């Protein structure tokens, strides 16, 4: 298993709140928690940047981390990521912050230590552009946004 360096920035992690870990052998994501000092109200339509109390350093440019919303918060409470998905580059070393957006109709109170997002690690391929005047024709061509049909 590849290694990622982890820096604990909030002393409550590992004591009051568990460190990120895979819940099951088949789990793809690690839960990130709100390392806030007091409950935080997020009004409808508002976004808040939430500290997680940790920083990671992936180092290997063949990998990146992706932050995703927790399905229960999004479906039941209307809390999703303000940027829809977060990307942590391999060379980033600062605190992981989660942009929380309340797309619901009611205020939402985020509890201290609440699980707010999940983080997965993904492979990365850096491509090199080759500038051309035309592309080799394909069946699809420039068709997009529903071009292949609804059903």
UniProtKB/Swiss-Prot annotation:
Catalytic activity annotation: dUTP + H2O = dUMP + diphosphate + H(+)
CDD domains xrefs: trimeric_dUTPase
Disulfide bonds: none
InterPro entries documented for this protein: dUTPase, dUTPase-like, dUTPase-like_sf, dUTPase_trimeric
Pathway(s) per entry: Pyrimidine metabolism; dUMP biosynthesis; dUMP from dCTP (dUTP route): step 2/2
Binding site for substrate: 70-72, 83, 87-89
Known cofactor(s): Mg(2+)
Keyword match Hydrolase: yes
Record-linked Gene3D superfamilies: 2.70.40.10
General function of this protein: This enzyme is involved in nucleotide metabolism: it produces dUMP, the immediate precursor of thymidine nucleotides and it decreases the intracellular concentration of dUTP so that uracil cannot be incorporated into DNA.
Protein name: Deoxyuridine 5'-triphosphate nucleotidohydrolase
Organism: Nitrosococcus oceani (strain ATCC 19707 / BCRC 17464 / JCM 30415 / NCIMB 11848 / C-107)
């Amino acid at each position: 298993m590849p290694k990622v360096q982890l820096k604990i920035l909030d002393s409550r992690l590992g004591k009051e709140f568990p460190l990120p870990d895979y819940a099951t052998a088949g789990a793809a994501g690690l839960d990130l928690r709100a390392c806030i000092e007091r409950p935080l109200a997020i009004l409808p339509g508002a976004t808040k940047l939430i500290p997680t109390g940790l920083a990671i350093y992936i180092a290997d440019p063949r990998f990146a981390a992706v932050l995703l919303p927790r399905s229960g918060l999004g479906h039941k409470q209307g809390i999703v990521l303000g940027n829809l998905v977060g990307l942590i580059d391999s060379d980033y070393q600062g605190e992981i912050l989660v942009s929380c957006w309340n797309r619901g109709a009611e205020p939402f109170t985020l509890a201290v230590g609440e699980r707010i997002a999940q983080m997965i690690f993904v492979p990365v391929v850096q491509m090199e552009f080759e500038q051309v005047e035309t592309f080799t024709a394909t069946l699809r061509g420039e068709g997009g946004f529903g071009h292949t049909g609804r059903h």
